[in-house]
Structure formats: structure tokens, C-alpha cells
Amino acid sequence: MVEFYFHDNKDTLENFTEDHNSGEPVSFDQLAEIGVIYKYITTQEELDALATEREYKNRDVVTLNLPAFNNDIDAYNAKMQQFYKEHYHEDEEIRYIAEGEGYFDVRDKQDRWIRAKLSPYDLLILPAGIYHRFTLTNAAKHVKAVRLFKDEPKWEAINRDTGKNTEARELYAKTIAV
């Protein structure tokens, strides 16, 4: 089952897959303030109903683990570092965990990292424009996730260090009054 807490900010390139739990939990109300939605979904019917309700027309399945990269540790590490780089998307990011575990980190209004530890049956919806990052857990080193999309699947990350603000980012910042 999901855990939400403030990140301890003690991560490095060598240990970012560890849990980094500060001991300060985060409530669902705190997540709602930044537009993050969490659901616990145990059946395909529930997932399909959510997709219909939120007008998600497309989906795919992604598997992240070393075998998915033909056991090429360099390619695997490069992808994990890419996902862990702080970024946002112009569309909602919807992930349903089917297998394994992963961490999604999102920024709160004070620019602190909130960490979500996701396991099977956890679904997370991140609003367009929110800064976030992802990594596998050190324990599992594997995740199989269903990605849901309103339109055709696209995945363009806009890294924070570029300083680029699109309409999606500006709208998100206004929505949460940052």
C-alpha cells in the first residue's frame, strides 16, 4: 500500500533508490492542495471505469528492470538517471502499478519533495505542469506500470534546469497559487 512522506533530501547519484523517509508523513489533503490524486484500484473493471470517467482513451504497459534493458547496466542506469531528473509534462501523468515498486517525488507549494512509494494496485495522477521525478525502489528494482493517456501517448519531459515554462507549467503554478 502507498506511503506518502517528505523526502529527507539526502539523496545522491549513488543512493537515490533508497527510501529517504524524513519521518514526516504527508496527508491526502496535502496532496490535493497540489493537484495530486491517489487511488487504490484492485480490479481491471475499476481501472477501466476510472479511464472512462477521466476520458483516458489510450494506454500502454511499461516494464522497468535490468532485463528490460537486455541486462545492459549502463543503459539501465542512464534511463534511471533520466527519470530521476526533475521535470514536468504538458499532460497529466497517470501511472497504475501492476507489479514491483517505485518512488514518485513531487514538489509541494514550498518546493519541498514529497515522496510517494507505490506498490501494486496504487494509481497516481500527477497534474500537467507539476515538477516530479521517478525511480525504482532499491528493494524491488522492478516495476510494471500501466500508463494512461487522454490522447495519443506522448512523453516529452521538460527538465526544470532548462528554465523553460510552457503554458501547462504556468497554468499549474496559477492553479496552486505558487
Curated annotation (Swiss-Prot):
Protein location: Cytoplasm; Nucleus
Primary localization: cytoplasm
Co-factor binding details: Binds either 1 Fe or Ni cation per monomer. Iron-binding promotes an acireductone dioxygenase reaction producing 2-keto-4-methylthiobutyrate, while nickel-binding promotes an acireductone dioxygenase reaction producing 3-(methylsulfanyl)propanoate.
Biological process, per Gene Ontology: L-methionine salvage from methylthioadenosine; methionine metabolic process
Catalyzed chemical reaction(s): 1,2-dihydroxy-5-(methylsulfanyl)pent-1-en-3-one + O2 = 4-methylsulfanyl-2-oxobutanoate + formate + 2 H(+); 1,2-dihydroxy-5-(methylsulfanyl)pent-1-en-3-one + O2 = 3-(methylsulfanyl)propanoate + CO + formate + 2 H(+)
Any GO MF annotation of the entry: iron ion binding
EC number per UniProt: 1.13.11.54, 1.13.11.53
Chain positions recorded as Ni(2+) binding sites: H87, H89, E93, H132
Family assignment from sequence similarity: Belongs to the acireductone dioxygenase (ARD) family.
Function: Catalyzes 2 different reactions between oxygen and the acireductone 1,2-dihydroxy-3-keto-5-methylthiopentene (DHK-MTPene) depending upon the metal bound in the active site. Fe-containing acireductone dioxygenase (Fe-ARD) produces formate and 2-keto-4-methylthiobutyrate (KMTB), the alpha-ketoacid precursor of methionine in the methionine recycle pathway. Ni-containing acireductone dioxygenase (Ni-ARD) produces methylthiopropionate, carbon monoxide and formate, and does not lie on the methionine recycle pathway.
Listed name of the protein: Acireductone dioxygenase
